[in-house]
Amino acid sequence: MTDADYAEQLKDLDATLRNIESVLDIDRLRADKARLEEAASAPDLWDDQARAQQVTSQLSYVNGEINKLAELRSRLDDAKVLLELAEAESDPGALTEVEAEVAGLAKAIDEMEVRTLLSGEYDSREALVAIRAGAGGVDAADFAEMLLRMYLRWAERHGYPTEVYETSYAEEAGLKSATFTVKVPYAYGTLSVESGTHRLVRISPFDNQGRRQTSFAGVEVLPVVEQTDHIDIPENEMRFDVYRSSGPGGQSVNTTDSAVRITHIPTGIVVTCQNEKSQLQNKASALRVLQARLLERKRQEEQAKLQGLKTDAAGSWGDQMRSYVLHPYQMVKDLRTEQETGTPAAVFDGELDAFIEAGIRWRKQQQLADDNA
């Protein structure tokens, strides 16, 4: 490529970055930072721990967004200077350096651009993620546990705080179900593309004959309920049951009935929570999960009404959306976006960004197609 080609690429990247800065509203982010820093410095902040955690989490996120934009702007300016030097000195080595920096910038700006696609009503919310073992017996339960670790590792890689509300262990190995939250703004908009049925193909470590086994697990991503949602549930619409928390193999891990199960009588929705130390804490966590499920149900009903369709409760789990194949070859493939990789071990260790970004772009394309239909 010529100097002029690189100059044109940098011009395009500059325009894209300016658009990102405009959509994300850098001035608003700075104002949010000042407001949150003031709240974080209040002497009585930690009198309300939930509020304190929310403020510190939001401040960390806003600082991260501002720093990412500043870093991209700085790198872009440096690349322009580097290109000018390469042109002035006619130095092929410097031009090679420009090529590498332009390629890296294009990738980083492309990743940042994905954030501008999160404009749904609840996209800015924290996320509540539920994982449930499907068909496949003990392999499905093991797969559910693998998915839980995958998402927690993804959050850890990004420095996102998480809280596991519930883990229901299967008798032999793995999990029947698990529920956790990702406590950072836009977690719902980001992770909601992970909702659906996940499929694992491998040689079963639980089969004495070493046969290949296909198993399934469902992932459901919900927006965390906020006070403005006004999701009030009358006491007479709920049935509360308490029991002892259980660990792997069905072993009791508590000597008191601290685990809580709530059944919402009108809808039949059941939620459980057993990871907190006290029954009161588990009840509060279970109520938050129930509120999130009812909010999602309300959202689906409103969407169905707009589309003139009938709500399908099972549809919240979505169709089969990703396959993880460990035998006879190694591949993870998203069936909607065609995004794939030959390194499933890395994916299970939380390297999900490429799949999530492709999913967000795919969803936006689907929305635009529906709007134009």
From Swiss-Prot:
Top-level taxon of origin: Bacteria
InterPro entries (alphabetical): PCRF, Pep_chain_release_fac_I, Pep_chain_release_fac_I_sf, PrfB
Molecular function GO terms recorded: translation release factor activity, codon specific
Gene3D superfamilies named in the record: 3.30.160.20, 3.30.70.1660, Release factor (1.20.58.410)
Pfam short name (any one): RF-1
Localization annotation: Cytoplasm
Disulfide bonds: none
N5-methylglutamine: residues carrying this PTM: 251
Keywords from the UniProt entry: Cytoplasm, Methylation, Protein biosynthesis
Record SUPFAM superfamilies: Release factor (SSF75620)
GO (cellular component) term, any one: cytoplasm
Post-translation changes: Methylated by PrmC. Methylation increases the termination efficiency of RF2.
Keyword Protein biosynthesis: yes
Protein function: Peptide chain release factor 2 directs the termination of translation in response to the peptide chain termination codons UGA and UAA.
Family: Belongs to the prokaryotic/mitochondrial release factor family.
Designated name of the protein: Peptide chain release factor 2
Lineage: Bacteria, Bacillati, Actinomycetota, Actinomycetes, Micromonosporales
Recorded name of the encoding gene: prfB
